[in-house]
């Protein structure tokens, strides 16, 4: 990931986006999400400079940040839910998830517990369900 972000090739991606892009960085992938977001912003700036035409009519052109704020809170009995804190209607969404991130912890019954791969996957399913549950494009 680091090599790809640092070796920016200005001629590689000269395309208009089909729809506004959204990026969700699940717990444990926040650092990588920031890197992908900075690369996408660089791509957006380069596209605006190099492509002919008016980019202001392109869907999502006014966004300054591609990261979408989400949370997966837990209830007292251990159950969880996925919450997306802004509208993503019409967006092309990408989700970064690392099921092996044992450094992510949550509190249950007053104890701090590391997240298992199954819990990461359950949070991923919760966010997909909160998005509408299926791909539209």
Listing of model-derived features with the role each one plays in the protein:
Residues 1-137:
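PRPP-associated nucleotide enzymes
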């Amino acid at each position: 990931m680091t090599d790809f972000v640092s070796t920016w090739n200005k001629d590689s991606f000269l395309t208009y986006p089909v729809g506004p892009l959204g990026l969700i960085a699940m717990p444990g992938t926040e650092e990588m999400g920031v890197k992908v977001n900075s690369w996408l912003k660089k791509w957006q700036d380069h596209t605006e400079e190099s492509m002919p035409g008016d980019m202001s009519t392109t869907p999502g052109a006014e966004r300054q940040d591609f990261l979408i704020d989400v949370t997966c809170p837990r209830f007292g009995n251990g159950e969880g839910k996925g919450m997306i804190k802004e509208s993503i209607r019409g967006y092309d969404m990408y989700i970064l998830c690392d099921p092996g991130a044992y450094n992510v912890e949550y509190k249950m019954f007053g104890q701090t517990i590391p997240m298992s791969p199954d819990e990461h996957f359950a949070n991923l399913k919760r966010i997909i369900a909160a998005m509408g549950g299926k791909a539209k494009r």
